A protein has these predicted regions:
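Conserved acidic, metal-coordinating active-site core of Asp-based
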Residues: 87-181, 185, 189-197, 223
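Short, well-ordered beta-strand core segments
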Residues: 6, 31, 62, 184-186, ...
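Asp-based, Mg2+/Mn2+-dependent phosphohydrolase catalytic module
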Residues: 180, 185-237
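Active-site phosphate-binding/coordination module
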Residues: 17-103
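Short, hinge-like loop/turn segments at secondary-structure boundaries
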Residues: 56-59, 79-82, 148-149, 202-205, ...
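The start of beta-strands in P-loop NTPase/AAA+ ATPase cores
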Residues: 4-6, 60, 165
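Asp-based phosphoryl-transfer active-site loop
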Residues: 2-18, 178
Length: 237
């Protein structure tokens, strides 16, 4: 078995409007039954994820907060991979009128319409923070922390090579971890720039696309091993 791990994004990949349908859940269970590991790699805060997805136990590990937090569903253990946001930064954002501000243990997120206010606060306070885009959202994390950070930590805990993972995503913030996987997939509703930088694009959107690729994987890994097109952003060996 070459591909022993499936690493998937949540919103826009597994989930449509925040929910995962029954067919997708059943396919994930089939993948687990095949002896493979499941990783969820999401920008969501853990509590937000729990509210919409009670089946966290399907996954061996969950990378939350866009790579800043690693969670073990079986034990409830959480491991922070980044520092919490400075209170001065949060205060400045609130004073600037950045509405819909979401603050996790490490991540800060708001609407993309407030991107300028976020940049201004980072610069004026001289903070070592970065902005990560995710469709209509802006996420703020320490420099060097993204989905690849949590993905690497999760694979290390599983003691499996990164090249043994099939990664599935849909948006800008998924580049970081898909770029490391042995095989990368964009679902049909993914942004165009992501579709140009992966090994496979599904015909189906979100959950239907995930089901499509996992069915192929369970039937045979041969098509995955052979599909190595020219990529605009070459993957690491």
């Amino acid at each position: 078995m070459r591909f022993r791990v499936i690493a998937a994004d949540y919103d826009g990949t597994l989930a449509n409007d925040g929910r995962v349908d029954q067919e997708t859940l059943q396919m994930l269970a089939c993948v687990r039954d095949s002896g493979r590991k499941l990783l969820l790699v999401t920008g969501r805060e853990l509590e937000s994820l729990r509210m919409v997805f009670p089946q966290l136990g399907l996954f061996d590990l969950i990378v939350a907060e866009n790579g800043a937090l690693l969670y073990h569903p079986a034990t409830g253990e959480q491991r922070l991979l980044a520092k919490s946001p400075p209170s001065a930064f949060l205060d400045m954002l609130r004073r600037s009128g950045a509405n819909s501000l979401s603050v996790g243990r490490c991540i800060v997120a708001t609407l993309r319409s407030h991107e300028a206010e976020v940049y201004k606060a980072i610069e004026e306070l001289g903070l070592n923070l970065q902005i990560i885009l995710n469709r209509e959202s802006v996420m703020v994390l320490p420099v060097g922390v993204d989905k690849s950070t949590g993905f690497r930590a999760a694979m290390a805990e599983l003691r499996l090579p990164i090249a043994s993972a099939v990664g599935i995503g849909d948006a800008e913030n998924d580049y970081a971890f898909l770029n490391l996987c042995g095989f990368s997939v964009a679902v049909g509703n993914a942004i165009p720039s992501l579709k140009e930088r992966v090994h496979l694009v599904t015909s189906g959107d979100d959950g239907a696309g995930v089901v499509e690729v996992l069915q192929k994987l369970l039937v045979s890994e041969d098509s995955f091993a052979m599909a190595t097109p020219e990529l605009s952003d070459p993957f690491e060996p």
